[in-house]
């Protein structure tokens, strides 16, 4: 009887440990659904604290043109951009010209002006998404593609913890979706990888990005609604493309040229540079000696 009591006691202890462990695991799973932990909350507070600290704004921010009239030496180019973008049917554009003549600034300001028009398709919150064709990188297997978008599989690419545990792939929309309803500005578009450019052309035609994954099972009841929608319908990507380049038009992919209106920005002449220098000095409250603007322009 004593041996039996010992066995009963031992079995009860084992069952208790199993029960405690089961409760512990359940609590851990519940906590995982709350993505915020004391550590992540602390890091968020640190970031928000950093955001409250500002040094003086850069000189470039101060002197950058804020209106179309402030853009020097590019009257014809700016007028052409207005006619192409500030319309009921805005067109994709290719901007040619040397660096530093105001291509990006003009595009941003024209969008802001176009949003004020009653007939424009651009909404008040239409985004201006800017990237550089020389730095765009992607994986030929589409495991990583910040421009078009990609799918993070649950095994190799570190999907969200709750998705990785259930084996659910997660689509990651790219810059083309971020620019939906607005403008995607690609500086040095002539330097883009040709295959990536072809993918971009496909998006321009479809106005949508499709996602595929061997790990996606549409019958899985655990798939979140947003992931199911992305795999079923794709991500919207209806935007106006503006590509800027310092290359000669003959060096640009004919397929992209055929879809875009072309605008040429002129090199700045000494008189333009002198006007820019004087405007900058006025904006900064600086006093220049005679001949300084002329010296800079030579």
Language-model features: locations:
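Interdomain "pre-motor" coupling segment immediately N-terminal to P-loop NTPase/helicase cores
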Residues: 2-55
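Pre-Walker A (pre-P-loop) alpha-helix and adjacent loop at the N terminus of AAA/AAA+ ATPase modules
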Residues: 55-98
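Conserved C-terminal "switch" segment of AAA+ ATPases
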Residues: 117-123, 154-158, 249-255, 265-297
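Conserved alpha-helical scaffold flanking the Walker A/P-loop in AAA+ ATPase domains
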Residues: 82-84, 144-183, 224-232
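Conserved AAA+/SF3 P-loop NTPase catalytic/coupling segment centered on the Walker-B
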Residues: 139-148, 171-205, 249-258
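Walker A/P-loop
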Residues: 85-136
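Conserved catalytic/switch belt of AAA+ P-loop NTPases
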Residues: 152-157, 195-234, 254
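AAA+/P-loop NTPase substrate/partner-engagement loops
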Residues: 116-150, 155, 218-220
């Amino acid at each position: 009887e004593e041996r039996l009591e010992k066995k009963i006691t031992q079995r009860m202890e084992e069952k208790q440990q199993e029960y405690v462990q089961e409760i512990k695991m359940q609590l851990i799973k519940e906590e995982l659904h709350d993505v915020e932990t004391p550590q992540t909350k602390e890091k968020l507070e640190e970031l928000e604290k950093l955001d409250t600290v500002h040094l003086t704004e850069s000189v470039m921010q101060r002197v950058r043109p804020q209106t179309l009239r402030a853009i020097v030496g590019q009257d014809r180019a700016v007028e052409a951009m207005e006619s192409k973008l500030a319309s009921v049917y805005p067109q994709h554009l290719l901007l040619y010209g040397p660096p530093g003549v105001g291509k990006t600034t003009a595009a941003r300001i024209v969008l802001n002006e176009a949003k004020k028009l009653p007939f424009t398709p651009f909404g008040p919150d239409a985004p201006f998404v800017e990237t550089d064709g020389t730095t765009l990188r992607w994986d030929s297997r589409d495991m990583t593609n910040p421009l078009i978008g990609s799918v993070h599989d649950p095994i190799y690419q570190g999907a969200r913890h709750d998705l990785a545990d259930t084996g659910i792939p997660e689509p990651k929309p790219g810059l083309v979706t971020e620019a939906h309803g607005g403008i995607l500005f690609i500086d040095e578009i002539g330097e883009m990888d040709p295959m990536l450019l072809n993918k971009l052309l496909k998006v321009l035609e479809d106005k949508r990005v499709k996602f595929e994954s061997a790990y996606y099972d549409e019958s899985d009841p655990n798939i979140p609604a947003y992931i199911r929608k992305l795999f079923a319908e794709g991500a919207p990507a209806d935007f106006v493309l503006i590509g800027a380049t310092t290359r000669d038009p003959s060096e640009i992919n004919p397929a992209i040229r055929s879809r875009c209106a072309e605008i040429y920005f002129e090199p700045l002449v000494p008189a333009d540079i002198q006007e820019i220098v004087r405007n900058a000095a006025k904006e900064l409250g600086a006093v220049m000696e005679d001949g300084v603007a002329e010296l800079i322009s030579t």
